């Protein structure tokens, strides 16, 4: 046995400290952004106008997506100037932001549960119509589910069957949305497409920013859960559509 083989054998025979391993697992686990930090940064960078600016960014996120550089190419000069001003003021980034980076989608997240009224009049925009998802599942797809940030409202303390139904119904949107915005995924296998959105989705679900009681209240208000905290029949049917996709 040479020196390196000996090192390998000795390493493999070392005792495992489960407490230390668990600490490492928690330290190295994927973490999404902290919504509290996003709010703090908005207030600090925006001063007195941060609330008005946040509303503008929420509208942009819901109607035009998460990529300011691309959206200004097809926008009125006035609108383009406003977007560029917001990008500069709040240091808005796109692509792969760091944990504390501000994106349009992240600005939406802290207030997603309170934005239900927006969906009632944002009916002509690409992301709020939902025609392709409704046509695909044969049900009226819940508009509140039609944004990646919705995962932050899914209550992980629901009964497993109902949690899975809400999760899989939302995955149908994420699946179709991912193929729409990422050309390389359009011919990909279902598992590969799901892998592309699973980490941020799970991070949002496991976030502590909105507690489970409040999440459940939002889901009930949106008609995604019944008053008894069960997934509605529509949500269950949509979930089945996703499960049958190949």
Swiss-Prot record:
Gene name linked to the record: N
InterPro entries: Capsid_Phlebovir/Tenuivir (IPR009522), Nucleocapsid_Phlebovirus (IPR015971)
Name by which UniProt lists this protein: Nucleoprotein
Main location, first listed in the record: virion
Quaternary structure (record): Homodimer. Homohexamer; ring-shaped, necessary to form the nucleocapsid. Homopentamers; opened pentamers in solution. Binds to viral genomic RNA. Interacts with glycoprotein Gn; this interaction allows packaging of nucleocapsids into virions.
Keywords for this protein: Capsid protein, Helical capsid protein, Host cytoplasm, Host Golgi apparatus, Host nucleus, Ribonucleoprotein, RNA-binding, Viral nucleoprotein, Virion
Annotated positions binding RNA: 30, 33, 67, 105-106, 186, 196
Record's function text: Encapsidates the genomic RNA, protecting it from nucleases. Displays high affinity for single-stranded nucleic acid. The encapsidated genomic RNA is termed the nucleocapsid (NC) or ribonucleoprotein. The ribonucleoprotein has a non-helical structure. Serves as template for viral transcription and replication. After replication, the nucleocapsid is recruited to the host Golgi apparatus by glycoprotein Gn for packaging into virus particles.
Species in which this protein is naturally found: Sandfly fever sicilian virus
One Gene Ontology CC term in the entry: ribonucleoprotein complex
One matching Pfam family: Tenui_N
Record remark on domains: The N-terminus is involved in homooligomerization.
